[in-house]
């Protein structure tokens, strides 16, 4: 697949000992979905992806294949009525992360695809997922252009992601065989913070704590003898209560 798109360096990476060949297929009513393999690392491809002028060089590359169960060719021409059905969302998903927030889109993902021998091949790339190797890392392939919450279930208590068995369509879900020794929990948490909102929540909490400290410091300066220096008595708001009230 990498050779087909003209990236010889990436093709060599997929042939190397660090690449993982999987070739697992899941079957659906209209389509068969195959996870072919994964390669990850720094500077393993000739074609580079940029974000805000910065080259993203530490990447994961995933190859998938989709074919029709009845053996008919995948449509190549936009004029074909079935061409509009050939929309698939391919994304790694991370255990413990809401997949609606953390997926290939938020992970700086891009893809290239082509049809060969009646099969749709897609090369998906995103940020290197090996830092999450101490968790279960999934790959979803579903119909549509975006993550479909109806196609999968996310258990917030366990962080597990599963297929919605009653979903009528394509909702393949593979577990990626990553080496736990490659995990980097500290880097993973740092990477996830802006994606999951934890960074913003932390900033809000810091602001709240700072405000509380400033309020405490102010109140420590106020005494019954000097309160008139800091506050103005408003007669209309004064209420007097006796022991009988």
Please place each PLM-identified region on the residue numbering:
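Single-pass transmembrane signal-anchor helices and their membrane-water interface zones
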Residues: 1-9
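Polar, acidic low-complexity tracts enriched in Ser/Thr/Gln/Glu with frequent Gly/Pro and Thr-Pro motifs
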Residues: 11-245
């Amino acid at each position: 697949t990498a050779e087909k798109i003209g990236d010889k360096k990436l093709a060599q990476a997929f042939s190397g000992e660090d690449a993982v060949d999987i070739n697992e297929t899941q079957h659906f009513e209209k389509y068969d979905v195959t996870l072919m393999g994964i390669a990850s690392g720094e500077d393993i491809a000739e074609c580079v992806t940029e974000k805000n002028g910065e080259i993203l060089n530490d990447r994961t590359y995933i190859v998938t294949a989709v074919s029709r169960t009845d053996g008919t060719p995948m449509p190549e021409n936009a004029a074909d009525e079935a061409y509009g059905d050939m929309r698939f969302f391919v994304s790694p998903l991370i255990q413990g992360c809401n997949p609606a927030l953390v997926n290939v889109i938020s992970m700086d993902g891009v893809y290239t695809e082509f049809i060969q021998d009646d099969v749709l091949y897609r090369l998906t790339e995103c940020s290197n997922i090996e830092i999450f190797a101490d968790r279960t890392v999934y790959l979803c392939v579903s119909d549509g252009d975006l993550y479909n919450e109806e196609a999968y279930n996310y258990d917030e208590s366990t962080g597990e992601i599963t297929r919605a068995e009653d979903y009528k369509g394509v909702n393949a879900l593979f577990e990626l065989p990553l080496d736990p020794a490659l995990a980097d929990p500290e880097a993973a948490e740092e990477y996830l913070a802006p994606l999951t909102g934890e960074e913003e929540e932390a900033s809000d909490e810091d602001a709240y704590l700072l405000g509380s400290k400033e309020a405490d410091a102010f109140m420590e300066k106020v005494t019954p003898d000097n309160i008139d220096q800091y506050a103005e008595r408003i007669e209309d708001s004064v209420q007097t209560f006796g022991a009988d009230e």
